[in-house]
């Protein structure tokens, strides 16, 4: 798209479009041809796209007429064509300032070639193909959900089995003199048998939910048992609420 600024404030519209056609050097004035002046004037006023799309007919022509106070001009050399309309007499009024590109723009010249039309069509096709993109995004979401599920499954395997809890409770009973059933109740109540359980608010960790602001994190089950025995020997059953 190329825009050309004209100085005249009376020009209303101007379109120029490139087009390949069979050359015909015969030219005719509007008065010499049987053309529908009213129809051409209506196209210029209300449907300029049709005039930009193709010439009036093949070959060279030159139609110029005045209708309704406007002067209309339609020309073609057989390869390119142009059309415009202005208030009658506007050209002579602005001939002295036609080169003044600083004047207020009132007319735009539009130039379109066949290559540009094809380029625009190709661009439209590309935009349609791009609609397929959301499918890839949907698949990605599904894969993410599957990954999340797998992670949760892995986390649940850290829960200590019932037989292991019984064995831990029996060892704690032997080392402290407190019954295995009581130690089993503490383990199930405090951590549900999860040796890696962490209380987000207090920082308590492991099977016995030992307090220590994180220093117990990563301890083995045996280390947790040793620490629990130490806490019991120092603080007694009161170290665990609702013994």
Swiss-Prot record:
Residues 147-159 have a biased composition (Low complexity). Residues 1-23 form the signal peptide. Its EC number is 3.2.-.-. InterPro entries: Lysozyme-like_dom_sf, RPF, Transglycosylase_SLT_dom_1. Residues 106-159 are annotated as: Disordered. Is able to cleave peptidoglycan. This is Probable transglycosylase IsaA.
